[in-house]
Amino acid sequence: MIKGWTAIYYRELLILKRRLPRQIGAWSVSPLLYLVAFGYAMGQGVSIQGHTYIEFLIPGLVAMSSMTQAFAIGSEINIARFYWHIFEEFQAAPISNGAYVLGEVLAGMTRALLAVSIILALGMLFGVKLSLNGFFWAGVLLNSLVFASLAVALAMLVKSHSDQAMMNSFIITPMAFLGGTFFPLERLPEWIQSVLSILPITHASGIIRNAAFGHAIASENWMVLAGCGFICFIFAVLVVHRARD
């Protein structure tokens, strides 16, 4: 019998499997538009840190997509809460708060990995070769952990789908464009760099891009991202405990 976090994770996988063809199409459109519009139309002849712009862009898209798709698990949780009342069933089930959070977080991380795989496949079609080493995937997984955990926590706090949309607008969208995904932060004023340095996506972009280029990765990036992942996961467990009571 499937029980604990595996039951939660398996349920989300079944939902994802049923929607996978449409999801693949949806996950492909935005990266393809970014690659064509920014990588070719605007990035021709542009060199950043010794790489073409499209080479610089793809690791940024990986960081951004792993963030957005991991965070999207929050919408799935809210649909289950508001329409199917799945959370009420969980409240009555002998499943610990940590197991529930772990199952949902793993589902969000799985979505993120699938979306990242599509971006990398598109990059190969555009002739971009990156070093997909262990550090690269560790950065993707940590980034996904942070935002999937945050999504679970916020999904327990919001009261409606409009509240969830506001979270996307105020949290995810700014980080998607200001976290070093589309341009190097060194081009911004120092005070803005200081503000952006507290964002987990900034450190995720640094890890993923440096790993993809075979460059050294600052230990600060690892510590901040891992710390954010731990804090967000514990926060999610506490919020679920409060919602369950």
Language-model features: where?
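Hydrophobic transmembrane alpha-helices and immediately adjacent juxtamembrane helices
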Residues: 1-127, 131-134, 138-206, 210-245
